[in-house]
Amino acid sequence: MLAGCVRGLIARGDRVTALARSQSSLSALSESVPAADRDRLRTHPCDYRDLEALAHALRSIPVRPSAAICWVHTPAEPVLELVRALFPDIDLLRVVGSSTEVPRGDGARFDRIVRLGFVIEGDRSRWLSNEEISNGVVSALLSGQPSTTVGTVTPWDAHP
């Protein structure tokens, strides 16, 4: 769902390291990037639930990252803590679903949240498209805002 986000960042000239649980999704991602830009994409298959393997993959990144976009399911805290431990100064964006309670921390931990909502169209609602998710996450990254909602999460009884 974040493939468009990766492509958008690469199109801006950024270098991106993408981690995903399946090699097939990483291969599809790589193939979707223009050949001339693929040198700015590194991929690592890694199940984020295996913290040792994740730490190894993160340590293998050749250039210290300035930002990380983490969309991990519960329990996400160990993954986020590992990213923070390895890269203390990183701009960490945590992507969460519409029903996830947004953490209210001291600002030192997971201080940037991107909450994915839904879209209301007339008397119906729908979940965000992959393109809307990707565009919203890139916008959130570039905005510098501590909290961003893509779409809406209210009224909750209108969700799909």
Cite the ranges covered by each PLM segment:
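Canonical Rossmann dinucleotide-binding motif of NAD(H)/NADP(H)-dependent dehydrogenases/reductases
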Residues: M1-T17
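Residues at the starts of beta-strands that form the adenosine-phosphate
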Residues: D14-V16, R40, D91
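Conserved glycine-rich Rossmann-like NAD(P)H-binding loop of the short-chain dehydrogenase/reductase
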Residues: R12-A28
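A short acidic, often aromatic-flanked loop/helix-cap motif at beta-alpha or helix-coil junctions
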Residues: R49-E52, T100-E101, F118-R126, P155-A158
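The conserved SAM/SAH-binding core of class I Rossmann-like methyltransferase domains
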Residues: L19, H44, V95
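Rossmann-fold cofactor-recognition segment
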Residues: V33-A53
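Rossmann-like short-chain dehydrogenase/reductase
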Residues: L2-C5, S25, Y48-L116
